[in-house]
C-alpha cells in the first residue's frame, strides 16, 4: 500500500470558494467538514487560508498573491502539508510542491488517505489500494523509487527504460493484480447474495452521509455489533447480518460505507464489491442526522449519489437520526 501521512504533521489548509451558479445548493459548513477530514487524517491544523476564485490558474490553481501567503505560513509553521479543499490537477499539485517545498494534497488525496487508515478487511484494503494507485497513476511525473524496492529492484527494467516508465509499469501490474483479486471477491459476494435470495430473505441496506449514525443504528439489533465512532468513514466494509427480532427474522440488515460530497470517482469504481450490496437490496434505509444544521444539503448529496449509482428504482425509507440532539 502507498505510504500514508506521517504521525500528526502540521498542515496549512486552504479553502478556495468558487464563483458558481446555483450557490443555494452549496453546503453550509463545508469548511467545518473539511477541517474534520483533516483532523481524521491525523493532521494538526496550524493555519487556515481563505479566498475566492473565479477561474483557477493552470499552473498553481490560485493566484500569485495567495501562493505567497501560503508559502509564508508554511515557512513560519514548518508545515509538512498543505491541504486544499479543492481538486488539483497533477501539474498544479507538482508546481505548488516546488514552491512550498512541502507535500501538497487536494481533497481527493485526503479522502483516499483517510480510507487507507480505516480499511480493516482484506477486501477493504485492496479496494483502497486500487483507488490510491489509480489516483497515483495520473500523477506519475516524479520519481517513485520506493515502488521499485517493493519488487526487488535489480532486473526489473527493460533496456533503456526510465525510472518513470518503470514506476508506471509496476503500478499497472499491481492494478491488474488487485482487479483480479477483487473480481474473485465480487463473484463470491454474488454467490452469497444469490443464497440470500434463494432463502427468501429480504435485505435492508443502510445508506447515508458519513457520520450520520448508520452503524450505531445497525448495532441496535442484538446480533449486529460493529465498530462505531463519531468520525468520518468509521465503516468502510459492507456487512450483512441477520437479526434476532422474532417478527423480522426474514430480514437481513446491511451496513455500508458512508457517502460524502464530491466523493472521488476512484473510490466509487474501486468499491464495486461493496457498493454492489446496495444494488441487490430490497429497501434502502436512508439514515439522516437531523441534528446537523447542514442535513438538507447532505440529504441532497446522498440522493444524488444514489441516482448516479443507478439505485433510484429501489424503495427508499428515510430514518431521522439523532433527534435528541437536534
Give, region by region, the residue ranges found by the protein language model:
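Canonical P-loop GTPase G-domain recognition
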Residues: 99-159, 312-318, 324-326
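Conserved Switch II/interswitch segment of TRAFAC-class P-loop GTPases
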Residues: 25-26, 53, 57-60, 87-90, ...
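Conserved G1/Walker A P-loop phosphate-binding module
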Residues: 10-19, 143-283
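Short hydrophobic segments within beta-strands
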Residues: 22-24, 207, 319
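Hydrophobic residues in beta-strands of the RecA-like P-loop NTPase core, especially within AAA+ ATPase
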Residues: 84, 105, 253-254, 320
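N-terminal accessory targeting/assembly segments
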Residues: 1-113
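Alpha-helical coiled-coil heptad-repeat segments used for dimerization/assembly
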Residues: 72, 128, 135-138, 142, ...
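Amphipathic alpha-helical transducer elements in NTP-driven molecular machines
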Residues: 28-32, 64-67, 90-93, 105-108, ...
Amino acid at each position: 500500500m502507498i505510504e500514508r501521512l506521517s504521525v500528526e504533521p502540521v498542515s496549512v489548509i486552504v479553502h478556495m470558494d468558487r464563483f458558481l451558479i446555483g450557490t443555494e445548493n452549496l453546503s453550509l459548513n463545508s469548511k467545518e467538514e473539511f477541517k474534520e477530514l483533516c483532523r481524521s487524517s491525523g493532521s494538526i491544523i496550524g493555519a487556515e487560508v481563505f479566498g475566492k476564485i473565479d477561474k483557477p490558474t493552470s499552473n498553481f490553481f490560485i493566484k500569485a498573491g495567495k501562493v505567497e501567503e501560503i508559502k509564508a505560513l508554511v515557512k513560519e509553521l514548518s508545515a509538512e502539508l498543505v491541504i486544499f479543499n479543492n481538486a488539483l490537477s497533477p501539474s498544479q499539485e507538482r508546481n505548488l510542491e516546488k514552491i512550498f517545498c512541502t507535500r501538497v494534497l487536494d481533497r481527493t488525496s485526503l479522502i483516499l488517505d483517510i480510507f487507507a487508515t480505516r480499511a480493516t478487511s482484506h477486501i477493504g484494503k485492496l479496494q483502497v489500494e486500487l483507488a490510491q494507485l489509480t489516483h497515483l497513476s495520473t500523477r506519475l511525473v516524479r520519481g517513485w523509487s520506493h515502488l521499485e524496492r517493493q519488487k526487488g529492484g535489480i532486473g526489473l527494467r527493460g533496456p533503456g527504460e526510465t525510472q518513470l516508465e518503470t514506476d508506471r509499469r509496476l503500478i499497472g501490474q499491481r492494478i491488474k493484480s488487485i482487479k483480479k483479486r477483487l473480481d474473485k471477491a465480487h463473484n463470491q459476494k454474488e454467490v452469497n447474495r444469490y443464497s440470500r435470495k434463494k432463502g427468501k430473505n429480504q435485505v435492508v441496506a443502510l445508506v447515508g452521509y458519513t457520520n450520520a449514525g448508520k452503524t450505531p443504528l445497525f448495532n441496535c439489533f442484538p446480533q449486529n455489533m460493529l465498530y462505531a465512532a463519531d468520525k468520518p468513514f468509521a465503516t468502510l466494509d459492507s456487512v450483512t447480518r441477520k437479526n434476532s427480532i422474532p417478527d423480522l427474522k426474514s430480514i437481513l440488515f446491511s451496513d455500508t460505507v458512508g457517502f460524502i460530497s464530491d466523493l472521488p470517482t476512484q473510490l466509487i469504481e474501486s468499491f464495486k464489491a461493496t457498493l454492489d450490496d446496495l444494488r441487490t437490496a430490497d429497501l434502502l434505509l436512508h439514515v439522516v442526522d437531523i441534528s446537523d444544521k447542514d442535513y438538507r444539503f447532505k440529504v441532497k448529496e446522498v440522493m444524488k449519489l444514489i441516482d448516479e449509482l443507478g439505485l433510484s428504482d429501489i424503495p427508499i425509507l428515510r430514518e431521522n437520526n439523532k433527534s435528541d440532539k437536534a
